[in-house]
């Protein structure tokens, strides 16, 4: 019994092995090319090699004694060869294409009969247009190829991975994160604000001082000092273009415009220093009841330095005005004529509005006169001085007079506090008059003095140096600043006449010469402002300041004579 059962098991196992193993000379088909029964059991058919002449059942169907039917096969769900190619990376064109397998060849050409499935492998299909399109460069790509030439992976390579390999990124342009997005803003100017705000630019390149044509009034000139020269230009592309055009205009401007702007650049900080020095003198220990017994620390050199600097700059401005015929050396403004024609009529505008010639002009003639006068006022073509610069010169002179008045007042109070007269053997006589050449750090106690009263000798020496420095300033601006004052009056009168129009009526009188004051500070009288009204803040205040300064000089001299025994 046991031997019989073992024999049956061995026989069954041998039969199964014979069924599993293909017989010799049989062609092993794929599951898809097998018959319906074998495909249902997911087995491969074994078709005898001798049965190519007609429909021959497979070995399994023959042993099972069932009909072997090769039914119609369902179409495969796999995409075709043309659709599988775009799924490969973009660089697939450089890789060799894989050779077709026998299974795929038989699957593509297999028919409903076993003779077709058992035939030899057909030749590979000819290369499609996709291979040619992939092997071409982007420049030679044509529209005749398939629409799905580039897949989504190429976009990811371009937008993320390709940024680090972009030739537009220069070394050192990657940030700490290494994402490489900086080239997107640096290469394309999509945002002008990021370009300007992120870079530290030279203020002299992105912003240049305006030309005199752009400064019609003194207020605008003073307002330019409050601008932050380190700020960026406007954030719009139009503003940037305007800045570049303005820079080119300033570069190509004539020498007259640049020289007219240079004194303004020097006058603005100099006037600021004058204001600070006056504040220090008025709030120092020499003011009020706590007046010390000695003036050894008095900053005489700083006052002399301000006088020297202001006289040099103001001399350049007024020399230019005199050369242009805007004012004479004695402070008398000449007649300035601007001609404009309207048909057959001619109008003449002078610096005196009461002497207008001609009848009322039309709007076109008024516009022509206004443009002509504006050009002359700005000092563009005629090489003159604009109103803003003239006002700065006159304002600087007034600040200097206030500084001198404070210094002389301190000397006067100090001399008045000294008790009794002291003998002196000529101390201070022949003192140095080289005031403008003194050091800015010079103190009153450092001045030379001889005799038994050194304080009186030093004050006498300082007074002589201050007189010499002020005499040089008035040599440039006229006595009492008459040249600068009359230049301002002439410019303002002409501007007022042009704004009212030719023949439009009255104006202000020109600045006349004033009476002199005693000593150094005697000044000229002021004139009325535009419109015929007298401005106390103009010439009249100048006369008061100058006369007051002259009175202080005389008072200090009398006190020195009294204390020194002369």
Swiss-Prot record:
Instruction: List the Gene3D superfamilies hit by this protein, alphabetically.
Output: Zn(2)-C6 fungal-type DNA-binding domain
Indicate yes or no for the key word DNA-binding.
Answer: yes
Please provide one cellular component term from the Gene Ontology annotations of this protein.
Answer: nucleus
The protein's matches in InterPro entries, at most eight in alphabetical order, are given as: Zn2-C6_fun-type_DNA-bd_sf (IPR036864), Zn2Cys6_DnaBD (IPR001138)
Please name the SMART domains in this protein's record: GAL4 (SM00066)
Segments carrying the region annotation (Disordered) are 1-31, 72-174, 346-382, 422-453, 500-551
Function statement = Transcription factor that regulates the expression of the gene cluster that mediates the biosynthesis of the tetramic acids Sch210971 and Sch210972, potential anti-HIV fungal natural product that contain a decalin core.
Q: What is this protein called?
A: Transcription factor tasR
The species this protein belongs to is Hapsidospora irregularis
Gene assigned in the entry: tasR
